[in-house]
Amino acid sequence: MTRRSILTAAFVLIAAALAPAALAAADPAAVINNLGNRALEVLGKSATPAQKAARFQELFREDFDVPGIARFVLGRYWKTATPEQQQEFVKLFEDYIALVYSAQLSAYSGEALKVTGSRPGPEGAIVASEIVRPTGGPPVKVEWHLTDRNGTYKISDVAVDGISMAVTQRSEFAAVIQRSGGQVQGLITQLREKTANSVPR
């Protein structure tokens, strides 16, 4: 499994259980653990692929710190973008991530999410977990970075086996911008083309 498909498996386990109020700042480990336990009941055999994809999109839009992640992945180019470009990029980034990961939902094959602990993070908490595969083998370590936004946790990054998905995405976007002569508009145009008529609004 790729890092994206492994991460998608983790998302699938919590997607159906998540709601904006569910990430209220309590015990961070309990938040992720409880969501994982509840999600499997919702994402049963009766859920269609389209329903699962829609739930993932809702998850990302409501419970991730989308503006903060968007600024991070754009890196130094955020400051060179106009306010209009920044606004469009945040929306396109939201749609793009939902599209990319919802397309990976078929990779889920019964993995289980096990929370192993939590510790304070720079802006909130870091919840450690493992993806346990039904076929056996070593578990995959997944860390959820949570930011406390006025008493509510927002997910700001997810690291799979120590690899930050936000950092990985920033590198990919930087390469696109560099190929566009250092212009953010080149990335915006590409994201616009990839997400056109692909993500329900």
Task: Kindly give the residue locations of the regions a language model identified.
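N-terminal export leaders
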Residues: 3-11
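N-terminal signal peptide c-region/cleavage motif recognized by signal peptidases
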Residues: 19-21
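Early exported N-terminus immediately downstream of N-terminal targeting peptides
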Residues: 26-105
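Surface-exposed, charged secondary-structure patches
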Residues: 99-140, 190-201
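Short beta-strand edge/turn micro-motifs at domain boundaries
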Residues: 139-167
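Low-complexity, intrinsically disordered terminal/linker segments enriched in charged
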Residues: 157-201
